[in-house]
Amino acid sequence: MKIRKIVAMLTMAFLATSVFAASKKITDMIGREVTVNPGSYKRVVCIGAGALRMYSYIGSVDLLCGVEDIDNTSLKQRPKMFDSVARPYVIAYGDKFTKLESAGVGGPNTQTAEAEKILMCNPDIVISEYEDKEKEDALQEQLGVPVITLKSGPNGVFDDNFRNSMILLGDIFKVQKKAKKINKCIAAQAKEIQKRTAKVTDKPKVYICGLGNWGTTNHLMTAQNYISFDIANVDNVVTGLAKKGNQPIEKEKFV
């Protein structure tokens, strides 16, 4: 009997040590320290603008147990402002998204995560793009699972925030090689485009418009430091704006 008790105690101690060893603290993209168990997650929910897109680059969509309504094209009642915009991750995986539970409405007009809807999906981790530390901490407390915040940054896939988000996801889901491959591929493509366009002398002046800013916009929404133009050595006609990033200009300036 004593031997059995000793064996049982040793087994429990071993299991506890294994779980402890598997856990690690990571720092998400808004500086929050979160304890995770890398490679252990089987049920994933992505919330907030950009979270599902970034996860789709690197994570398995088969692990998703819920999506926000904006990404479920089978729903009649949902935000539709991006239906006319090409969203590669929806084109690639949209049929799978339609089979998943609702994790909330989503979209640019939703500023708070819907905890009850997320709980109904029963995730063991949440990937978020809501960049409010207090709200993210509160949501994590409500859900009882890690809530990891990503950031894409103003320059999209060419942004340091995007690259670091890929590295973070790679660590959490134990796909570090894939994260490195994605970042390396994007950097190589940017370098190749720069190389091909560097010696172009006859450059037409170009205006970019309709840039997203918490939803769809019009011809007056532009940027003077549009990253794709910078990489491709394009002559951007927009100059002299007070700040960087996507912003509206006056009709007079457009004309």
Regions found by a protein language model. Give the residues of each.
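Bacterial N-terminal signal peptides that target proteins for export
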Residues: M1-L10
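Bacterial N-terminal signal peptides
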Residues: M9-S18
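Bacterial Sec-exported substrate-binding components of ABC uptake systems
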Residues: V19-Y57, K177-I208
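Short helix-initiation/N-cap motifs at beta->coil->alpha
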Residues: M29-G31, L100-E114, G153, L241-E252
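Proline-aspartate-enriched helix->loop->beta-strand connector
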Residues: Y41, V105-T110, E114-E131, K251-V255
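A short, structured surface patch at a secondary-structure boundary
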Residues: L52-K117, I125, V237
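Extracytoplasmic substrate-binding proteins
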Residues: K135-W214, D235-G240, N246-P248
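Alpha-helical, coiled-coil/dimerization segments enriched in small aliphatic residues
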Residues: N218-G245
